[in-house]
Regions:
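Flexible hinge/capping segments at coil-to-helix
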Residues: 34-37, 43, 140-157
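Bacterial signal peptide processing site
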Residues: 25-29
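A ligand-binding cleft/hinge motif common to bilobed small-molecule-binding domains
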Residues: 115-123, 170-171, 194, 199-229
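Short loop->beta-strand "edge-of-pocket" segments that line small-molecule binding or catalytic clefts
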Residues: 51-54, 150-165
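Extracytoplasmic small-molecule ligand-binding "clamshell" domains
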Residues: 44-114, 258
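Periplasmic-binding protein-like
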Residues: 56, 132-140, 209, 213-250, ...
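Ligand-binding cleft/hinge of the Venus flytrap
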Residues: 64, 78-85, 165-184, 212-217
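Ligand-binding clefts/hinges and TM-proximal coupling segments of bilobed small-molecule sensing domains
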Residues: 164-181, 219-223, 252-286
Length: 286
């Protein structure tokens, strides 16, 4: 090969080499494979909201305000206890006549409705520690001559169906006595007393005193009788719900210990209770 040919060969080779180098430099790098997605932790389950059945026609324990909200002594006490126990609750207006069926069927987790702790009820449901002391009381018109429970034997007596007032009057007059007039609520029975449809009403002292004080035009008076045994209210739960029962008892004990219970009691009844409602239930109000 002549020197000229050699020089051309080298130039051509150099150009080819440079082209190959540029092509190699211009090649894009392949993208690295994307990392496998990391499984996210499951979202925490929402906190359970316990359904509380209450017959909101029993002031001052439970009633509805002008906004339709359920308010009252029971509501404040159990709301405060639930907060202490770290549980969420929701009150649902539930007619008294079906309230325990709703509990038994699981439609309600608890019943808070001035429910008296009785041996009969304890056979089918569990109760929290008592939170209110009650007793039956007679309401009559101011001019009535009734001075004791036995005076009602020949009179027309109004009661709320299925309450301990109903039980007491049934024992005195006989369960099927036509002189016993049964109503869906105690306020309805008291309205009937005001209009003259019945001669007396027997019901829990708290609701009777509240109604009489707020209806001065009815010209009522109240009559106490030692024959009426003390009663206590408790929170009713489905039989065997021991975990919820323990939490509620914990909450009730806490609000009694820190003074919250006394504050609520004074709000509704004008003064703190004479004694705490923490003794065992002694008898078979609402």
């Amino acid at each position: 090969m002549s020197p000229l040919s050699t020089r051309r060969f080298l130039q051509t080779a150099a150009l080819l080499g440079a082209g190959l180098l540029l092509a190699a430099c211009g090649k894009k790098e392949e993208a690295a494979p994307a990392p496998a997605p990391v499984a996210s932790a499951p979202a925490p389950a929402p906190a359970k909201v316990y359904a509380v059945g209450t017959d909101a026609a029993y002031a001052p324990f439970e009633s509805q305000n002008e906004k339709g909200e359920i308010v009252g002594f029971d509501v404040d006490v159990v709301t405060a206890a639930a907060k202490k126990a770290g549980i969420e609750i929701k009150f649902i207006n539930t007619p008294w006549e079906g309230i325990f069926n709703a509990l038994g069927q699981g439609d309600r987790d608890m019943v808070v409705s001035a429910v008296t702790i009785t041996e009969e009820r304890k056979a089918t449901m569990d109760f929290s520690a008592p939170y209110f002391d009650a007793q039956q009381l007679i309401a009559v018109k101011e001019n009535s001559k009734v001075s004791k429970f036995a005076d009602l034997k020949k009179l027309k007596v109004g009661v709320q169906t299925g309450t301990t007032g109903d039980e007491a009057v049934s024992k005195l007059l006989g369960k099927t006595n036509p002189n016993i007039k049964r109503f869906e609520s105690t306020p309805l029975a008291l309205k009937e007393l005001e209009s003259g449809g019945v001669d007396a009403v027997v019901a829990d002292n708290g609701v009777v005193i509240h109604y009489v004080a707020n209806n001065p035009g009815g010209k009522f008076k109240t009559v106490a009788d030692k024959e009426f045994v003390p009663e206590q209210y408790g929170i009713a739960l489905k039989k065997g719900n021991t975990e919820l029962l323990a939490k509620l008892n914990e909450g009730l004990a806490a609000i009694k210990a820190d003074g919250t219970y006394d504050q609520i009691y004074t709000k509704y009844f004008g003064a703190p209770p004479a004694k705490a409602a923490d003794a065992p239930a002694s008898a078979a109000s609402k």
